[in-house]
Amino acid sequence: MTTKLIPAQQYHDIFIAGQPLIDLRAPIEFDRGAFPSSVNLPLMVDKEREKVGTCYKEQGQQAAIALGHSLVHGVVKQQRIDAWLNFLSAHPQAYLYCFRGGLRSQLTQQWLQEAGVTVPYVQGGYKGMRQYLIGVIEAAPSLQPLLSLSGMTGSGKTDFLKRRKEAIDLEGIANHRGSSFGKNIDPQPTQINFENRLAIALLHHQLGNHACLLLEDESFLIGRSALPQSFYSAMQTADIVVLEEDDDIRLTRLLDEYVHKMHRGFIERLGLEAGFEAFSHYLLQSLGSIRKRLGGKQYQELQDIMQQALSQQLNQNQTSQHLAWISLLLHKYYDPMYEYQLQKKAGNILFRGSHQATHEWLDNYQSER
């Protein structure tokens, strides 16, 4: 058999190219974390892997290998090979990987070669590529200056970032808008997948000739996704650009994000009745998540207004009453908290301005570096 190996020196190229990858690990391993361009076509499913692992601990490697062959043979073996071949027919340049680039990769490569197809496997496997991506995140703050984009809730920071080539949208990677109402309909990635996606975004960013890395001024947690500690620490000392926006525009934007888009998304996913119920649950649960910080009286006031707005929306198909609780939430909760946090970093502020003025300032910042 000819062994075709992709060396660790090519990890960078794999992630930049979005190289199609066949992940041979068991589903339980894949679900904890993998890579965006990978598909899980396991050599062994969870129960098979568990049995082989127990055998390895109790009887050693040779016994475990023999058990693996007895579990994956005949029809089962052919089904696994067919699944790989089907994927390879659509992605003939794909690579294989298992946890460490060991026996599972080698055996799969052998079986595929016997079927007439030679497929390389990645040296070091998942573990090697994962460690490489962790290193990318740890090194990133030292490669170029970080610049933090700040602004009150509803000021349009995400929309602004999407127009900047030097920016990475952390909330997009986390699939969460950052605030207590920031949950999206689709779930957030696992912590490992969040970190892997961040690292790959950093690799792509580093290909550009950018004067800085522009990021939104985030908390340590974006929903349930935690920023890597070293990366977050570097963000806390970054220079700051503050995006300013009129209150009426902020309110209109949040009405669209919290109410119109989420309601539409739930309806499209679940239908009219179940969709509205899920949408109502999303709003009330989001408010409930900050109940302690609001205090009992303010929470109850907001909840009453929100329920009235939901009733009006259900019965009259009008959403204007939602502006009442959004306005109260901004002025009594989000804005004071934002001002308090920004004041602690006041010495780091380089510029304040509107969307247009901030774009112009950043263009000049880029050209002067």
From Swiss-Prot:
Known catalytic reactions = 5-methylaminomethyl-2-thiouridine(34) in tRNA + selenophosphate + (2E)-geranyl diphosphate + H2O + H(+) = 5-methylaminomethyl-2-selenouridine(34) in tRNA + (2E)-thiogeraniol + phosphate + diphosphate; 5-methylaminomethyl-2-thiouridine(34) in tRNA + (2E)-geranyl diphosphate = 5-methylaminomethyl-S-(2E)-geranyl-thiouridine(34) in tRNA + diphosphate; 5-methylaminomethyl-S-(2E)-geranyl-thiouridine(34) in tRNA + selenophosphate + H(+) = 5-methylaminomethyl-2-(Se-phospho)selenouridine(34) in tRNA + (2E)-thiogeraniol; 5-methylaminomethyl-2-(Se-phospho)selenouridine(34) in tRNA + H2O = 5-methylaminomethyl-2-selenouridine(34) in tRNA + phosphate
Q: Which UniProt keywords apply?
A: Selenium, Transferase
Q: Which GO terms describe its molecular function?
A: transferase activity, transferring alkyl or aryl (other than methyl) groups; tRNA 2-selenouridine synthase activity
Q: Which Pfam families match?
A: Rhodanese (PF00581)
Which residues are in the Rhodanese domain?
15-138
- GO annotation terms (biological process): tRNA wobble uridine modification
Cystine links in this protein are none
Q: Does the keyword Isomerase apply?
A: no
**What EC numbers are recorded for this enzyme?**
2.9.1.3
Q: Where is the active site?
A: C98 (s-selanylcysteine intermediate)
* Known function: Involved in the post-transcriptional modification of the uridine at the wobble position (U34) of tRNA(Lys), tRNA(Glu) and tRNA(Gln). Catalyzes the conversion of 2-thiouridine (S2U-RNA) to 2-selenouridine (Se2U-RNA). Acts in a two-step process involving geranylation of 2-thiouridine (S2U) to S-geranyl-2-thiouridine (geS2U) and subsequent selenation of the latter derivative to 2-selenouridine (Se2U) in the tRNA chain.
| Binding partners and assembly | Monomer.
The family note in this entry says: Belongs to the SelU family.
Query: What is this protein called in UniProt?
Result: tRNA 2-selenouridine synthase
